[in-house]
Amino acid sequence: MAKRVKVVLKEDILSLGKDGDVVEVAPGYARNFLLSQQKALAVTPSVLKQVEYRLAKKAELEAAKKQEAIDFETALKTIGRFSIKKQTGEDGVLFGTVTNGDVSEAIQLATQKEIDRRNIIVPEIHETGKYKVQVKLHSEVTAEINLEVIGN
């Protein structure tokens, strides 16, 4: 059986690992695919230092994004309630429905910060009233906001 070599991955590879992982692979696989396609680097002390530095920077950036999401969650809770005006019939039933795009616009008007509509989970809203809406701000931070739908 051939000796295995260690390489540091430069990108995520489904069958091997994630960016920055040190993995052992067959020499031919390393030489003919990973190294030639520049998907990995041969392990040396200087390469390991570079990888550690890059991973530390990545972790620091991720922590900053998480803290920003937590701060924005606090700001959303401070605001309390967001209101959306929709056209309704006489019985309070909406013409149409309230979408995550509508909620995104309401948040942007109140906070001047844009939230991607795909990160907002809105229940089925077909009439006026008060509702709870989930807003995913980060992979680990989700805010619940109060939404009031008002008819004209």
Curated annotation (Swiss-Prot):
Protein name (Swiss-Prot/TrEMBL): Large ribosomal subunit protein bL9
One GO term (biological process): translation
Keywords, comma-separated and alphabetical: Ribonucleoprotein, Ribosomal protein, RNA-binding, rRNA-binding
InterPro entries, alphabetized: Ribosomal_bL9, Ribosomal_bL9/RNase_H1_N, Ribosomal_bL9_bac/chp, Ribosomal_bL9_C, Ribosomal_bL9_C_sf, Ribosomal_bL9_N, Ribosomal_bL9_N_sf
Disulfide bonds: none
Function of the protein: Binds to the 23S rRNA.
Family membership: Belongs to the bacterial ribosomal protein bL9 family.
GO MF terms, alphabetically ordered: rRNA binding; structural constituent of ribosome
PANTHER family: 50S RIBOSOMAL PROTEIN L9
GO CC term (a single one): ribosome
Top-rank taxon: Bacteria
Gene3D superfamilies, A to Z: Ribosomal protein L9, C-terminal domain, Ribosomal protein L9, N-terminal domain
